Amino acid sequence: FRAVPAEGKKYTYEFSRENFYVYMISHMAKHFYENGCGIRNLVDIYVFNQKYGHSIDRTQVEQELKKCGILNFERQMSELALIWMENRKCSKFYVNLFRYMIDCGIYGKSENGIWSQLCKQNAPQQKKSFNLTYYFPTAQYMKEYYPWLEGKEGLLPLAWLCRGVHGLLHRDSMERARTLKDREKYRMMMEIYHNLNLNFVK
């Protein structure tokens, strides 16, 4: 709805550069939030900022990113893009983030979807509570996958049961459970997601 008629075109609409960048980052954030995303997105960020970074209205961009809950996400990813493309020195956080994105492949992996949910409910050091969170998620989380829970929170135990049966029958769910047993990976992933502060408004 923010597209405007393209100059010299009768039937073509396009985003302003500012809105295109916000769309690009929000699309990346959506994938990162749900399944993780690959390093190809970093190339997009780097190329755009090299080409248009000095001419776009950065204040407008940051206001829109803040509304979407992804301003800090964009700042961290822009920094990582510079680190990678220009071979800059960086902290361990960016090394871990880059390795995670490489492992995600191009489109991410379904088993990565659990990290954003665990991060919402646990601090990085709260490893002892992740089992409870993973096997018995909050009603808010469960409603995303079981819409019939809306207004019927008393049926939450039934939804947990359905989720458990689904987990036993699907390979991705079993892989997630195995991954969560790796204490070092759990700590690293919690640090990544907390530092990105990804409060993505879906």
Predicted regions and their residues:
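Conserved NTP-donor binding/palm subdomain of two-metal-ion nucleotidyltransferases/polymerases, i.e.
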Residues: 1-202
